[in-house]
Amino acid sequence: MKGLHLHLVLVTMTIVASIAAAAPAAPGGALADECNQDFQKVTLCLDFATGKATIPSKKCCDAVEDIKERDPKCLCFVIQQAKTGGQALKDLGVQEDKLIQLPTSCQLHNASITNCPKLLGISPSSPDAAVFTNNATTTPVAPAGKSPATPATSTDKGGSASAKDGHAVVALAVALMAVSFVLTLPRHVTLGM
């Protein structure tokens, strides 16, 4: 058991180091630093984000709601980074459209991803904004423990970030997702090492 724990730590560190080393340094990393813990919270949504669950769990929705209430631009940033996160997130099975559905699926009041370009300080007509405007209409899914509600729009103001921000944060998110996946394996399963 102790050997498996050490192996998990080493695998996590290797994943983070390799992805961070491959990613170019990003300007304006302040938003990435600010939203770092929010990536960790979103790992509670991994089952929904990978399509293993048809609805987000209550823990997932509580985490998403906390992000939205505390700093809504970080929720936008998480979605944006999933879009620009590259093959590593796709290899884990993260479905971009599921992340985009989170505010609606968790039935957050006063939340709409159409506000994300403004919160992130990107031009609504830019290609970076397309992830939010092209996918703004999603079918709501009732999450576990929530009753149906109609999302409204947000009036929160936010800072700015470029689409390239947060590669190190994405690496951390990928590592956390990988660890979450491995921890869900039955105890008798070995990792082949």
Curated annotation (Swiss-Prot):
Lipid modification (GPI-anchor amidated aspartate), residues: 165
Gene inactivation effect: Reduced cuticular wax load on the stem surface and in silique walls, with altered cuticular lipid composition (especially C29 alkane) associated with diffuse cuticular layer structure. Increased number of plastoglobules in the stem cortex and leaf mesophyll cells, protrusions of the cytoplasm into the vacuole in the epidermis, and enhanced susceptibility to infection by the necrotrophic fungal pathogen Alternaria brassicicola. Increased susceptibility to penetration of the epidermal cell wall by the non-host mildew fungal agent Blumeria graminis f. sp. hordei (Bgh).
Disulfide linkage: 35-76, 45-60, 61-106, 74-116
Any one Gene Ontology molecular-function term assigned to this protein's record: lipid binding
Residues of this chain annotated as glycosylated in UniProt: 110, 135
Entry GO CC: endoplasmic reticulum; extracellular region; Golgi apparatus; nucleus; plant-type cell wall; plasma membrane; secretory vesicle; side of membrane
Gene3D superfamilies, A to Z: Plant lipid-transfer and hydrophobic proteins
Entry keyword set: Cell membrane, Cell wall, Disulfide bond, Endoplasmic reticulum, Glycoprotein, Golgi apparatus, GPI-anchor, Lipid-binding, Lipoprotein, Membrane, Plant defense, Secreted, Signal
Subcellular localization: Cell membrane; Secreted, Cell wall; Endoplasmic reticulum; Golgi apparatus
Membrane topology qualifier: Lipid-anchor; GPI-anchor
InterPro entries (UniProt xref): Bifun_inhib/LTP/seed_sf, Bifunc_inhib/LTP/seed_store, LTSS
Propeptide feature ranges: 166-193
The record's account of how the chain is modified after translation: O-glycosylated on hydroxyprolines; noncontiguous hydroxylproline residues are glycosylated with arabinogalactan.
Region (Disordered), start-end ranges: 138-161
Cleavable signal peptide: 1-22
Expression sites (tissue/organ): Up-regulated in the epidermis of stems and leaves. Expressed in the epidermis, stem cortex, vascular bundles and mesophyll cells in root tips, cotyledons, seedlings, leaves, caulines, flowers, siliques, pollen, and early-developing seeds.
Primary location: membrane
Record-level GO BP terms: cuticle development; defense response to fungus; lipid transport
Function: Lipid transfer protein that, together with LTPG2, binds to lipids and functions as a component of the cuticular lipid export machinery that performs extensive export of intracellular lipids (e.g. C29 alkane) from epidermal cells to the surface to build the cuticular wax layer and silique walls. Involved in the establishment of resistance to the necrotrophic fungal pathogen Alternaria brassicicola. Contributes to pre-invasive defense against some non-host powdery mildew pathogens by preventing the penetration of the epidermal cell wall by the fungal agents (e.g. Blumeria graminis f. sp.
Sequence similarity: Belongs to the plant LTP family.
Protein name: Non-specific lipid transfer protein GPI-anchored 1
